[in-house]
């Protein structure tokens, strides 16, 4: 029977908020506390003073382990080292720039218990197919969600079941760099899991914070997702995805029967705003049709079929 473990990559420039971040995940910070290890992955070329700081983090919770890993993998180190050492475990990746709501882990684990063969993700990144056979990855940080103005936040927190990357290029450093420059780990993991025909289930577009959110957690300069998510960069990565893996991805996604069973905080507002709401990686669509009135259901189906988001 596999364990559930947490895995995070961090760097010295993130020390300022790391303690708060970790405390939101341990010692009663979460309603789910059943994970067996919390791996904090750091580069193997840091100063001694940095390692001393990280080693002290183990005093917070006895499940915390500090893993020194090859820094050249950059943001992919949130998953790569633990995929190698814990191949039979389910791995939840957590970011070091988020103060996690109390039910973040529980929501992932509950969905995983019902869908053991799927990746479970809090963040939904749409993927669309063009008439000329191209796959287009849409970074969700380019989607202007009004809910973000009301204390909502996007996060890459995800649960990866055991062996979803078996037989893929996920450990191929040269291909990872050719595709992402080490900046967009989520693209690398999406490509490889999709090539393995692994479905992804999204819990909703955004996570809600409980209580008052400290303003510094909204600091765009602090959050790597905002630094890495420039629209011009996304166009570059889309070109690379299609060059390296486009035909295989297109064939898999275009022949996939999508289920519409994931909910959103404000489904009506979302349908009003977006024409391209819906490919969750190669996984399931973002809304629950049963929550719609008949008129809104027809409007929703017309929109997504018109834009060739899914085969309904």
What does each model-found stretch correspond to?
Residues 1-24:
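N-proximal low-complexity "stem/linker" segments adjacent to membrane-targeting elements
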Residues 3, 36-37, 90, 199:
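Residues at the starts of beta-strands that form the adenosine-phosphate
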Residues 8-10, 42-44, 121, 204:
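Short beta-strand/turn micro-motifs composed of small residues
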Residues 17, 21, 174-311:
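C-terminal catalytic/acceptor-binding lobe
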Residues 23-35:
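Short, acidic, metal-binding catalytic loop of nucleotide-sugar glycosyltransferases
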Residues 43-88:
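Active-site-proximal specificity loops/subdomain of glycosyltransferases
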Residues 89-97:
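Short beta-strand-to-loop acidic/aromatic patch adjacent to the donor-nucleotide binding site
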Residues 101-174:
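Conserved catalytic core of nucleotide-sugar-dependent glycosyltransferases
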């Amino acid at each position: 029977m596999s364990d559930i473990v947490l895995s995070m990559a961090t760097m010295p420039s993130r020390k300022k908020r790391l303690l708060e971040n970790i405390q939101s995940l341990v010692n009663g910070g979460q309603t789910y506390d059943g994970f067996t290890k919390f791996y904090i992955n750091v580069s193997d070329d840091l100063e001694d003073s940095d390692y001393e700081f990280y080693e002290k983090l183990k005093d917070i919770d006895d499940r915390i382990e500090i893993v020194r890993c090859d820094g050249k993998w950059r943001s992919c180190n949130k998953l790569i080292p633990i995929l190698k050492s814990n191949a039979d475990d389910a791995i939840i990746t957590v970011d070091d720039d988020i103060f996690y709501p109390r039910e973040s882990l529980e929501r992932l684990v509950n969905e995983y218990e019902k869908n053991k063969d799927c990746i479970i993700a809090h963040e939904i990144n749409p993927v669309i197919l063009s008439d000329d056979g191209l796959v287009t990855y849409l970074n969700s940080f380019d989607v202007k969600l009004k809910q973000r103005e009301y204390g909502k936040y996007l996060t890459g927190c995800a649960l990866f079941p055991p062996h979803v990357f078996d037989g893929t290029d996920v450990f191929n450093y040269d291909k990872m760099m050719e595709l992402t420059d080490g900046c967009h780990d989520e693209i690398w993991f999406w490509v490889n899991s999709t090539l393995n025909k692994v479905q992804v289930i999204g819990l909703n577009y955004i996570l809600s914070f409980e209580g008052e959110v400290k303003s510094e957690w909204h600091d765009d300069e602090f959050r790597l997702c905002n630094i890495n998510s420039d629209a011009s960069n996304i166009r570059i990565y889309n070109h690379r995805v299609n060059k390296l893996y486009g035909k295989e991805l297109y064939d898999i996604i275009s022949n996939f029967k999508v289920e519409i069973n994931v909910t959103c905080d404000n489904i009506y507002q979302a349908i009003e705003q977006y024409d391209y709401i819906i490919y969750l990686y190669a996984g399931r669509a973002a809304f629950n049709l049963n929550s719609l009135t008949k008129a809104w259901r027809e409007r929703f189906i017309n929109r997504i079929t018109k834009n060739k988001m899914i085969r309904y």
